[in-house]
Structure formats: structure tokens, C-alpha cells
Design a protein with these regions (language model features):
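Active-site-proximal cap/loop segments of hydrolase catalytic domains
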Residues: 1-5, 9-218
Length: 218
């Protein structure tokens, strides 16, 4: 969909990602926002060099673990003109008690429960770095997401609004963690419309007739 608007995409499977083998999937254990973040920035550096892209011509987006990384990235660099975090998390401590994974997932990832290692959980939570965020952020979340509860986006949205940062929160009623692939047709179409509106708004400042019409409709 983004390609139809003239955007290129740089995709990567960093440490912690799936589809490149167990070693890669396990490589971010204990260190969410560490090696994975560095590898993604290397991908951006390489693509920028190969295609002569300026610093202000980049957006960043991701869902689930990629949504976590999006929230993390914009708290650690200002190189992106806009960001989209879908079904994301921002607070590893609070997520541990609200996700359908319960406490076991965090116990595996961080070798202990939140109250055993509170500093470690918060050090690897994007919400901790919210004051450093200057990138406009679009949050997309289904309110029946049990894996990454919508309260995670609510936390991020509330914090950014409190700090007078630029943020937009799209809440999709009745949609689960898999909305982008298995959601109702109208919600999936609305999601695409939001993505294009947000990217056009910040990556194409001059705008187009289509972008201007969509902004009026949002």
C-alpha cells in the first residue's frame, strides 16, 4: 500500500525477530532495545547510503514487538520524521500483569518477575524515555488485544499528551492483536487510510490532493 504512494520500504529482521532462526529470535533476551535497536539503525544507515536518502525522508513503523521497537527508537533518536506503533507495548512492568502471557513471558525474557528486577524492567521500557521523544507518533490499537493490551498505547498516549508532544491515537473497537491481517474489512481499510494520511503528512510536506482530502476525512 505504501508503495502505491511512492514510498520505498526498508525491512529488517533484527535480534529478537522471527523468521531467521532460533539464534536470532533469542538474541535480544535480557536486552530489548539494545542489540535489536543497533541492528535496525545499521539497516537505516545502509539504506540511506545506497539510495542517497536524506535524514528527514524516513518514517519508522512496526507492530507488536515491532511496535515496542518503534516506541523505543523514537525515544533514542530524532532521525525519523514520523512514527507508527501498532499493537505496541511501552511499559514492560505493567504489561507483565495485564497481558495474556501473564508474568511468564517477562520471567523468561528478564530472568525474573517485575518485582524482582524493577529497574531492569523499566530500563527496557520505552515509557521511561518519553521525555526524549520529539517524533510525531501515530498509535494504532484494537481494544480486544489480549497479547499487548490497549492500556499500553493508552499509557504512551497519555504520557506524550501530558508532555505536549505530537501524538494521535486510533482505537479500533472489537479488534484483536491480529487486526491488520484478520480484522473486519472496514477496520483494515481504515488502518491503511490512517497509515497513508500520517506518512503523507510528515514525509511529503507539500502534500497531494489525495493526502489533503484524507486529512479532512480523518
Amino acid at each position: 500500500v505504501l508503495a502505491t504512494r511512492g514510498y520505498g520500504e526498508a525491512n529488517s529482521t533484527p535480534a529478537g525477530g522471527q523468521g531467521a532462526g532460533e539464534a536470532v529470535s533469542r538474541a535480544s533476551k535480557h536486552d530489548w532495545g539494545g542489540k535489536d535497536y543497533r541492528e535496525l539503525m545499521t539497516c537505516v544507515d545502509t539504506a540511506s547510503r545506497l539510495f542517497s536518502l536524506g535524514e528527514k525522508r524516513w518514517g519508522v513503523m512496526g507492530g507488536s514487538y515491532g511496535g515496542f521497537l518503534t516506541n523505543w527508537i523514537i525515544g533514542h533518536t530524532d532521525r525519523f520524521s514520523c512514527a507508527v506503533a501498532e499493537r505496541s507495548t511501552c511499559n514492560r512492568y505493567s504489561q507483565a500483569g495485564t497481558s495474556d502471557c501473564a508474568f511468564r513471558y517477562g520471567e523468561y525474557e528478564f530472568d525474573g518477575l517485575p518485582w524482582d528486577h524493577p529497574d531492569h524492567y523499566l530500563a527496557h521500557s520505552p515509557i521511561t524515555y518519553v521525555r526524549s521523544i520529539h517524533t510525531p507518533l501515530l498509535l494504532i490499537h484494537g481494544d480486544e488485544d489480549m497479547n499487548c493490551p490497549i492500556s499500553q498505547s493508552e499509557e504512551m498516549f497519555s504520557a506524550l499528551r501530558l508532555l505536549h508532544k505530537e501524538v494521535y491515537f486510533a482505537r479500533f473497537p472489537g479488534q484483536s492483536h491480529g487486526m491488520s491481517a484478520r480484522g473486519t474489512p472496514n477496520c483494515r481499510l481504515d488502518r491503511y487510510r490512517l497509515l497513508l494520511w500520517w506518512m503523507d503528512r510528515y514525509l511529503d510536506r507539500e502534500g497531494t490532493a489525495e493526502a489533503e482530502k484524507e486529512e479532512q476525512d480523518v
